[in-house]
């Protein structure tokens, strides 16, 4: 399949590495390192400031809800002992173990243009992530309240960029079946471009993964100031899938499909 820029989707690979190695330690804490400040300056963030203390879990919430680059880089820097190249090597090794064949990871957050992937690989990565209960729980929240920190006197509310999760603010994007998702870029307002979105939805026991890659901003016809083309196409796919397909019993064991004559039986002539 076609290789595309991964952008913020790179965080799914960082989250996969965190959960693979630290799923039972998510309430451990770390201090946001100053060393990553210049790299993530003026990019997608959750206002997690240098020397503030966070749990691994809080960093994951920031990544999933706000596509926060400082959360990804800060956690990677901490867990790798400052060896970000080593962290990236682990990302690529795990990616290959998961089964990806057309992805390359060059940083922990997606700022670097060398991060590339494809629809099939993102499907494999998301399916792997869905095996972790913590990921499923974190992905499904429309908002997360970040506790007060050293440089934040009051808690702050992180509103998920996945508008499909919010009944109150998601508007036409909202779908009750949406379970979670991540985009490569947030949205387009005065600028233009393409967007990718990887997500999953569930209804009546049926789960589908959606990997919509490089949707042009012009395809979003909902009319909002912020255009989310890949999310627009995703929710339309969700509608089509659940309107079109349903889980049916493969075979009713009490239903007779045919009658076969039986020879040499004293009890019956047919089965």
List each language-model region with its residue ranges:
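Active-site-adjacent loops and short helices of periplasmic peptidoglycan-processing enzymes
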Residues: 1-120, 124-133
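Domain-terminus/edge residues, biased toward the C-terminal soluble/receptor-binding domains
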Residues: 100-101, 113-117, 121, 126-271
């Amino acid at each position: 399949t076609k290789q595309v820029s991964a952008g913020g989707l790179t965080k799914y690979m960082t989250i996969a590495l965190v959960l693979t190695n630290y799923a039972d330690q998510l309430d451990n804490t770390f201090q946001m390192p100053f060393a990553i400040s210049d790299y993530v300056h003026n990019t997608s963030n959750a206002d997690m400031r240098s020397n503030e203390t966070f749990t691994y879990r809080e960093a994951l919430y920031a990544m999933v809800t706000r596509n926060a680059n400082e959360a990804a880089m800060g956690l990677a820097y901490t867990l790798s002992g400052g060896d970000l190249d080593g962290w990236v090597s682990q990302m690529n090794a795990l990616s290959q173990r998961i089964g990806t064949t057309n992805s390359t990871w060059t940083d922990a957050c997606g700022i670097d243009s060398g991060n590339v992937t494809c629809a099939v690989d993102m499907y494999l990565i998301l399916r792997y992530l869905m095996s972790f209960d913590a990921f499923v729980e974190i992905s499904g929240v429309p908002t997360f309240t970040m506790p007060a920190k050293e440089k934040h006197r009051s808690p702050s509310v992180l509103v998920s960029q996945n508008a499909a999760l919010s009944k109150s603010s998601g508007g036409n994007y909202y779908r009750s079946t949406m379970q979670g998702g991540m985009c490569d870029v947030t949205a387009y307002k005065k600028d233009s471009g393409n967007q990718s979105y990887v997500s999953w939805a569930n209804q009546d026991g049926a789960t589908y993964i959606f990997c919509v890659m490089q949707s042009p901003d012009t395809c979003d016809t909902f009319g909002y100031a912020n255009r989310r083309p890949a999310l627009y196409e995703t929710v339309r796919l969700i509608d089509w899938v659940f309107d079109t397909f349903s889980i049916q019993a493969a075979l009713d064991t009490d239903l007779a499909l045919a009658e076969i004559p039986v020879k040499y039986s004293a009890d019956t002539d047919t089965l």
